[in-house]
Amino acid sequence: MLMPKRTKYRRPHRVSFEGKSKGKNVIANGNHALVAKEGAFITNKQIEAARIAMTRYMKRTGKVWINIFPHLSLTKKPLEVRMGSGKGSPEEWVAVVKTGKVLFEVKDTTNSSKVEMEALRLASHKLPIKTKIVKKGAEV
């Protein structure tokens, strides 16, 4: 699973995912990309599930770029514990995704756009947000 090697703080403040993405909103590497249409927290397990879905479909004919990384830890207190006595322990790692962010990029060596589009469609079903598939050069 994806997670940072070291962090400055174990339990950071929660970051907002409202508004538009300021960075990573241009297709840099691949021919097609999966772009977020809404903001959310995406867990490391969801990113990994999407990556596996794409690479299994494309086999060895393509390359996948992942543009998001789960830097933020979310905490949770144990069940049936009274309020107070500090913040809970880190439960999972999430990536903060805002509207317009390029999540994944794909390039097929056989230059088959059908394969690229289908791989991104399969990956989009693994994510908890609405997404759209964009071709390089088109408006994100």
From Swiss-Prot:
Keywords in alphabetical order: Ribonucleoprotein, Ribosomal protein, RNA-binding, rRNA-binding, tRNA-binding
Q: Which SUPFAM superfamilies match?
A: Ribosomal protein L16p/L10e
Gene Ontology MF: a single term:
rRNA binding
Q: Name one Pfam family in it.
A: Ribosomal_L16
InterPro entries in the record: Ribosomal_uL16, Ribosomal_uL16_bact-type, Ribosomal_uL16_CS, Ribosomal_uL16_dom, Ribosomal_uL16_sf
tRNA-binding found in the keyword field: yes
Q: Which CDD domains match?
A: Ribosomal_L16_L10e
Tree of life domain: Bacteria
A cellular component annotation (GO) from this entry: cytosolic large ribosomal subunit
**Quaternary data:** Part of the 50S ribosomal subunit.
- Tell me the PANTHER family matching this sequence: 50S/60S RIBOSOMAL PROTEIN L16 (PTHR12220), LARGE RIBOSOMAL SUBUNIT PROTEIN UL16M (PTHR12220:SF13)
Q: Which HAMAP family match?
A: Ribosomal_uL16
Q: What does this protein do?
A: Binds 23S rRNA and is also seen to make contacts with the A and possibly P site tRNAs.
What family does this chain come from, according to its entry? Belongs to the universal ribosomal protein uL16 family.
Q: Which NCBIfam families match?
A: rplP_bact
Q: What is this protein called?
A: Large ribosomal subunit protein uL16
Question: What organism is recorded for this protein?
Answer: Onion yellows phytoplasma (strain OY-M)
